[in-house]
Amino acid sequence: MFVGPQRSARFEPDTMTKSSVPPNAPVALPPLVAAYVEATNSFDLERLMATFAEDALVNDQLRDHWGKPAIREWVKREIIGVRLTMNVTKVITHYENFIVTANVDGNYDKRGLPDPLVLAFYFTAQSDLIVQLIILRNRYDI
């Protein structure tokens, strides 16, 4: 799956620099991440839930949602309820972790938020399922 202009790289501490990844280089998302993004952008509750392990943890902006029942309620409210969409701009693979940067949009209260709103999604995978997802609004101005 290709989702707009992206940059992707495997993290190598001694050789990785921002300039080593060409801007706007399209790259396929890891299959699990692609499934999550596709389900999010199509507002498909069941496909989105199929990406998570039974005992997964989602931490969205410092709020924990443990296990599929809690994650289902979070998805209904915070993704489907506000018609959230993701435009992936960068992916970094680090072992079984995928760090995805995306511009997000939807029908949520945007007062006081930057445009575009850029969020970082920290996926941890095991057995082709998301076992942990941490979503943060990182600061890039420091």
Predicted regions and their residues:
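A solvent-exposed, acidic/Ser-Thr-rich amphipathic alpha-helical stretch
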Residues: L45-M49, E54-Y95
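Short, low-complexity N-terminal intrinsically disordered segments enriched in polar/charged residues
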Residues: F2-E46, A50, E54, I142
